């Protein structure tokens, strides 16, 4: 009899038999076959990976392949299963029968069965291989041992104790580098790649390398777009089984992972692990390029792209590339119009979660961002940043055409239209055109009579928020616009602008009739009456 091969321990099912198995039994079969293969590899028996194993590793049904492709050589189809009931023990028993039948096929001269001892330890006389079925297996080359808990095959092993270590919890294989222990030497070998940085499994599509073949298999789905794991609840599909498992918690609402420090609960163990770093302040993930440390490996991975400049995630719609997949996902909503983040208060939907978070402040009335200079509070940090420019006089937005600077980017955008003369926003009611959409929106309220901005102090309403803001200063007495030349303060910015012309002598409003200049548009309007003879 030749050496034991994978085909000697492979079990195949007919289509009818496979459909009679429930999920747990199929998982048991998958685990048994994969474990058998790993044990044979560990003992140096299997040279090339059988297609059946590749199939099982990828989560495919064994029946999707031709039988001769699965195990390299024709194998015996198991027919020892009852059609109505397929208990775990039946799979074990069938496995034993198939294995023994394999050896019987090699000839009875090399395979003899004898009754006798109850266990390997009791056998002092025969000193031969014990197969776990109360029988001795006499052969010059091989010994088969059957594990009490699961169906496993060990070849050319002096005893089955090394396999049983898995069930005892012992971890005899220790990493010299970091001290971590394992119950299998093969697992230790795989672990060592973390320290050596070895990445032998390379993607033929993009060249990316991985420590483990399973990671490469998973990675390939990025290129193929394959999503084999489907949620039975909502139909959503995932590229990884772990993603599906994590997703299912959304439907159950379960949060089994609780922080002992603060009691906060999480849906995923990884989220709890990440959360714990808040209490410890630990930043274990360090960038080799710049030395910056991070709490999460995912943040480090994202950070590294800054140094490489790589943008691997490309939009198929417009070709725009991004550094992170999450940014690409968000970008795609521009094309699809999808708004997945909905406000429970008013039903308004948003493309971005950050926009929803910002929007919610409207309902709460919360103004957490306070100006240290004047005490004014704002809903959003961006509004506070913009407001501070009133005090600092900063004007970061400069016009390339004429050099005029502005506090707000929107003001610069509006200003640029002066140079183009363009007025793209037209009122459908009266035909009047405007440089800015916001001005058109405000203008339309003249026709509708809408005044949505109401003063809480006196009840007066306005058609624009800027008018309400200016009005409120009557009650507060606030004069935030101060002249740097003379120190005089004003309630409105346009009054300050007009005042400054006293110091500069500027007269921008010119009469087309006689060429005379004026500081204010109202003064020019009054002057024009001289030419028209109109009585105001």
Curated annotation (Swiss-Prot):
**UniProt-listed GO biological process terms:** regulation of DNA-templated transcription
For this UniProt entry, the molecular function terms from Gene Ontology, in alphabetical order, are:
DNA-binding transcription factor activity, RNA polymerase II-specific; RNA polymerase II cis-regulatory region sequence-specific DNA binding; zinc ion binding
Zinc finger (C2H2-type) stretch:
173-195, 201-223, 229-251, 257-279, 285-307, 313-335, 341-363, 369-391, 397-419, 425-447, 453-475, 481-503, 509-531
Q: Which UniProt keywords apply?
A: DNA-binding, Metal-binding, Nucleus, Repeat, Transcription, Transcription regulation, Zinc, Zinc-finger
KRAB domain spans which residues?
Answer: 4-75
Where, per UniProt, does this protein localize? Answer: Nucleus
Family the entry assigns: Belongs to the krueppel C2H2-type zinc-finger protein family.
Per the entry, what this protein does is:
May be involved in transcriptional regulation.
Q: What is this protein called?
A: Zinc finger protein 737
This chain is encoded by the gene named ZNF737
């Amino acid at each position: 009899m030749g050496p034991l091969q994978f085909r000697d321990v492979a079990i195949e099912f007919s289509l009818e038999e496979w459909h009679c198995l429930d999920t747990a039994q199929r998982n048991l079969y998958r685990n048994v076959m994969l474990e058998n293969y790993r044990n044979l590899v560990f003992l140096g028996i299997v040279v090339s990976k059988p297609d059946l194993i590749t199939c099982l590793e990828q989560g495919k049904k064994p029946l999707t392949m031709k039988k001769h492709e699965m195990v390299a050589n024709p194998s015996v189809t198991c027919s020892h299963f009852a059609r109505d009931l397929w208990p775990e023990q039946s799979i074990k028993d069938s496995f034993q029968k198939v294995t023994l039948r394999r050896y019987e096929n090699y000839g009875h001269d090399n395979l003899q069965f004898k009754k006798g001892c109850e266990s390997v330890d009791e056998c002092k006389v025969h000193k031969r291989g014990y197969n776990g079925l109360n029988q001795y297996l006499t052969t010059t080359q091989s010994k088969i041992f059957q594990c009490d808990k699961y169906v496993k095959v060990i070849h050319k092993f002096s005893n089955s104790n090394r396999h049983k270590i898995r069930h005892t919890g012992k971890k005899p294989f220790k990493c010299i580098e970091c001290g971590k222990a394992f119950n299998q030497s093969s697992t230790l070998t795989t672990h060592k790649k973390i320290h050596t940085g070895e990445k032998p499994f390379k993607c033929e599509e993009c060249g990316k390398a991985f420590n483990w073949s399973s990671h490469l298999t998973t990675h390939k789905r990025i290129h193929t777009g394959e999503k084999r794991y489907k949620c039975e609840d909502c139909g959503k599909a995932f590229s990884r089984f772990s993603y599906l498992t994590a997703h299912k918690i959304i439907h159950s609402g379960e949060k089994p992972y609780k922080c002992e420090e603060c009691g906060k609960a999480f849906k995923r163990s990884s989220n709890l692990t990440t959360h714990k770093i808040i209490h410890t302040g630990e930043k274990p993930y360090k960038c080799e390029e710049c030395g910056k440390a991070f709490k999460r490996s995912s943040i480090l991975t994202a950070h590294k792209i800054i140094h490489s400049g790589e943008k691997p995630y490309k939009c198929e719609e417009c070709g725009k590339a991004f550094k992170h997949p999450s940014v690409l996902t968000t970008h795609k909503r521009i094309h699809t119009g999808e708004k997945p983040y909905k406000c429970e208060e008013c039903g308004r939907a948003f493309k971005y979660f950050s926009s929803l978070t910002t929007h919610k402040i409207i309902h709460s009335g919360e103004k957490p961002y306070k100006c240290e200079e004047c005490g004014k509070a704002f809903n959003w940090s961006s509004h506070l940043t913009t407001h501070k420019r009133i005090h600092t006089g900063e004007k970061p937005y400069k016009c390339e055409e004429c050099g005029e600077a502005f506090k707000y980017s929107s003001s610069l955008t509006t200003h640029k239209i002066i140079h183009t003369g363009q007025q793209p926003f037209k009122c459908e009611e009266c035909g009047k055109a405007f440089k800015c959409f916001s001005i058109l929106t405000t203008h339309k309220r003249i026709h509708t009579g809408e005044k949505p901005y109401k003063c809480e102090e006196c009840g007066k309403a306005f058609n624009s928020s800027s008018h309400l803001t200016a009005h409120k200063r009557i009650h507060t007495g606030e004069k935030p616009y101060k002249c740097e030349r003379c120190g005089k303060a004003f309630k409105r910015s346009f009054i300050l602008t007009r005042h400054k012309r006293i110091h500069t002598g500027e007269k921008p409003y010119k009469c087309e009739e006689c060429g005379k200049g004026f500081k204010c548009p109202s003064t020019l309007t009054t002057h024009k009456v001289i030419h028209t003879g109109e009585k105001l």
